[in-house]
Every structure is written in C-alpha cells, then in structure tokens.
C-alpha cells in the first residue's frame, strides 16, 4: 500500500517558487530520505505533508485519500512530526512531554486514560527513556531531548513519521542513538518514515530510498547508491566534497586540500 503519492506539487512564497512540480511516491513501511542543499525545499515539503502549508498546485494523497479531506484530529492521529528544534521552555518531566502526544486521541487536558498511559509507556520503552520518565526535560542532553520528541510523536500512534533534521546539533554518539532508534521503529513496528536532512551520511544503512532535491526540483530518486553517485553530488555541491565507499555504503566528506 502507498503511504504517500505526490503529483505535480508546487509551492510558492512571496519571494519566489520553492517547490516545482514534485512527483514521487512512498510505500507503507518505507524509510525515505529527502536530501539537498539549503533552500532546496526540504522543510517546506514536510510542512505541506502535515498541512501547515497549502500547496499552490498539485495533489497529495495520504494512504489513498486526498490530504485536504482528512479531518484535523484524524490527521494528527495518522501523521506525527518531529521538528528540528527540540526546545522545551519549562521543566516538564519526560512523561508529561510524551503524554502531550496523546492529545489528538481525545484526552485533551483531562486525566489520561489507561490507553494513553499504555501508549506512553510503549513510546518510552521504544526510545529507551523509561528510566528518565520523571526527569525534567530541561536537564537532559541534546540527544536525550531529541529522543523525547521522538517518543512524543510515537505516543500519537501515527502511521507516518516525519523527521526534520533529526541529527542536527548532535554529537556523533547521540546521532548514532537517534538513528538506531529510528531504524528499530521501522524494522519492528513497520512505521513509515520520511526523514529530511542536510547530511547524506544518514542515508546508508537507514533509508530504503533517497530523494535528492535542488532548487525545489527532484534531481534524483532511487536507491541510496544511485543518489550518492559522486558526479551527481559534485554537480550540486561543487568540488568541495569527496565520496568514499564505507561498510554500510557510500559516505560523503568535505574535500580537504593536501597539506
């Protein structure tokens, strides 16, 4: 079954067109990586998929239904977004933040139901946060906070998970934690994932396919190795990169001049 079908998608801001005629599909249970340089339209695409923006033209089909036909509450039960910035201004506990993900299921600001608590317990378990349930989010590391945002999204019990730069501002150890968590969720729960990132190195070993955007257009869509083809990447990023084969697939590095 197709989770998403995008047909002729355009979006414009006042200062110009951001997306130009995107066409692609995402199968249920797939991890799709969306990559590209700054201003390629990656985050705009996510905002269109969760309907915080309305496209200028084109169609988005979500699990076989046009996106505008989804009631807001039903959409929030189906699609969850983990934003790039995991900022929480107040010292809510991890449990309280994750419980916020149950709002679309009708709990509101009343007492949580047994179903709410069971969903939160499962989300904490899947993200390895059970031992931190009572800790203030403001006391956590960057990687732990990112996992809290992921757990909150999982508490929504979505069918589609949207991730905006999930490893941004994290050190290598915390990046590995977050990526391993995403891979396990897809593998064990069959969750469909669309991951947006500047970092092409998250694709090998995680993404089933990758979509490369440039200036709002699809430059390449296919297997990760096809998208990380050196000549193609140099056409986008110039000679400032090099591509090397690693144990899990190709890796991209900044090209450093010889000493």
Where are these regions (language model features)?
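Conserved ABC ATPase signature
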Residues: 136-140, 144
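The feature captures the beta-strand-to-loop junction immediately N-terminal to the Walker
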Residues: 35-37
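Conserved catalytic motifs of ABC-family nucleotide-binding domains
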Residues: 157
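Conserved ABC ATPase "signature" region
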Residues: 99, 114-132
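Catalytic Walker B motif of ABC-type/P-loop ATPase nucleotide-binding domains
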Residues: 161-165
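Helix-to-loop junction immediately C-terminal to a conserved catalytic motif
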Residues: 50
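Conserved ABC transporter NBD signature motif
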Residues: 58-66, 75
């Amino acid at each position: 079954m197709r989770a998403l079908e995008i047909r002729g998608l355009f979006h414009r801001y006042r200062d110009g067109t951001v997306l130009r005629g995107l066409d692609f599909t995402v199968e249920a249970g797939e991890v799709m990586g969306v990559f590209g340089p700054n201003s390629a339209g990656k985050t705009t695409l996510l905002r269109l998929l969760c309907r915080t923006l309305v496209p200028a033209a084109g169609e988005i089909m979500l699990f076989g239904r046009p996106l505008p036909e989804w009631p807001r509450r039903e959409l929030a039960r189906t699609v969850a977004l983990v934003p790039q910035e995991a900022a929480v201004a107040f010292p809510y506990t991890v449990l309280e933040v994750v419980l916020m993900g149950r709002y679309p299921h009708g709990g509101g600001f009343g007492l949580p139901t047994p179903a709410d608590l069971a969903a939160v317990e499962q989300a904490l378990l899947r993200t390895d946060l059970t031992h931190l349930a009572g800790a203030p989010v403001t006391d956590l590391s960057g990687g732990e906070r990112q996992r809290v945002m992921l757990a909150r999204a999982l508490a929504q019990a979505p069918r589609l998970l949207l991730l905006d730069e999930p490893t941004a501002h994290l050190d290598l150890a915390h990046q590995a934690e977050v990526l391993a968590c995403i891979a396990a969720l897809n593998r064990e729960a069959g969750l469909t994932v669309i991951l947006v990132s500047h970092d092409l190195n998250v694709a090998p070993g995680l993404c089933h396919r990758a979509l490369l955007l440039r200036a709002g257009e699809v430059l390449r869509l296919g297997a990760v190795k096809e998208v990380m083809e050196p000549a193609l990447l140099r056409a986008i990023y110039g000679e400032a990169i090099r591509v090397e084969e690693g144990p899990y697939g190709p890796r991209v590095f900044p090209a450093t001049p010889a000493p």
